[in-house]
Swiss-Prot record:
This is Chitin disaccharide deacetylase. It comes from Vibrio alginolyticus. Belongs to the polysaccharide deacetylase family. Carbohydrate-binding module 12 subfamily. InterPro entries: CBM5/12, CBM_sf_5/12, Glyco_hydro/deAcase_b/a-brl, NODB_dom, Polysacc_deacetylase_ArnD. Keywords: Carbohydrate metabolism, Chitin degradation, Hydrolase, Polysaccharide degradation, Repeat, Signal. SUPFAM superfamilies: Carbohydrate binding domain (SSF51055), Glycoside hydrolase/deacetylase (SSF88713). It comes from the Bacteria. Specifically catalyzes the degradation of N,N'-diacetylchitobiose. Key enzyme in the chitin catabolic cascade. The keyword Hydrolase applies. Gene3D superfamilies: 2.10.10.90, Glycoside hydrolase/deacetylase (3.20.20.370). GO terms for molecular function: carbohydrate binding; chitin deacetylase activity; chitin disaccharide deacetylase activity; hydrolase activity, hydrolyzing O-glycosyl compounds. GO terms for biological process: chitin catabolic process; polysaccharide catabolic process.
Amino acid sequence: MKLNKLAIATLVSAALSQYAFAQTDTKGTIYLTFDDGPINASIDVINVLNQEEVKATFYFNAWHLDGIGDENEDRALEALKLALDSGHIVANHSYDHMVHNCVEEFGPNSAAECNATGDHQINSYQDPAYDASMFAENLSVLEKYLPNITSYPNYKANEFARLPYTNGWRVTKDFKADGLCATSDDLKPWEPGYSCDTANPSNSVKAAIAVQNILANNGYQTHGWDVDWAPENWGIAMPANSLTEAEPFLGYVDSALNTCAPTTINPINSKAQEFPCGTPLHADKVIVLTHEFLFEDGKRGMGATQNLPKLAKFIQLAKQAGYVFDTMDNYTPNWQVGNNYSAGDYVLHLGTVYQAVTSHTAQQDWAPSPTSSLWTNADPATNWTQNVSYKQGDVVTYQGLRYLVNVPHVSQADWTPNSQNTLFTAL
């Protein structure tokens, strides 16, 4: 009997050791993100993901539910439900993909009219307040078609967003970036004669930056991408939708891991030029951008026939290579009781990002909060708020006015910008 117990203990110990090795041997985390659904093609994409036991993040535009997105979208509601019921993350990509700025008068045929011109990335953003309101409109329409949508824990469209066209980031106070050549005021970014001055970006880009700041002040995190899985043969005859093969695309992911990929990605309109290279939250992570319409047989090519098998194969190869997959709500790790935190670590708690002030082991009554001495608020918002570690040179907004931070400090309730001339200068 003693021998049996010893044998069992040995086996258990070996199994645990192998498990621990497997846990520490992870190569990196891949975040599969899909833009511009829900459309009919979303269903097949989700089925492949489910078959491969991988969760993804879908940045949805609700105009497809209204049937005005100029896609194969009569099953859009079915796709939305399937994504939610399967546990995938549903995030916000605006109601109409900013097409209201592409045509003179937005209406049911606007998507087709914009597609006919191809001018999506000219004057894409014009009025920051109105453009930002399209994210709130997206929520309203999603909830109209699925009234119980907010009961899904994986419905995150009121917390996580991605701007159309632009590789933009608002993750923490010090983890921000914008696509400074993403859109233009005159020429498409790939047309002859186009030039981009990152020191003085287009009015459209400036408006997009303002939209990102509005979203951040409304509690959103926005994420761009490290790698774009797109056709390498746009513009040729069928099957023009053919994506990069799974093996070389995994090589692209390998090349992006632990590099400053958003600054080197091509083409120029896909870059995030001022991405904070080396930021710790970016370590060991690769965000893959792709689009559901690339996975259907239709007007653009043979996407389902060509690309659905590539998606499955890529997932299989990535797992074999040591990658794991996760969703964007876990990009910034959630605060957990019992975790050991080092000074400088970031967590997400109740919709707010915090940074650890001192090293400690989290306890139930030590949760991050506006009054915590263990954590400071590290949200990407520009609005002044309490318990933020402000640096000299930071610019904040308070009661509609902008202020420059003169002295580094952690904000307190009675140190508002309008009452502390030594800490702030009005702009």
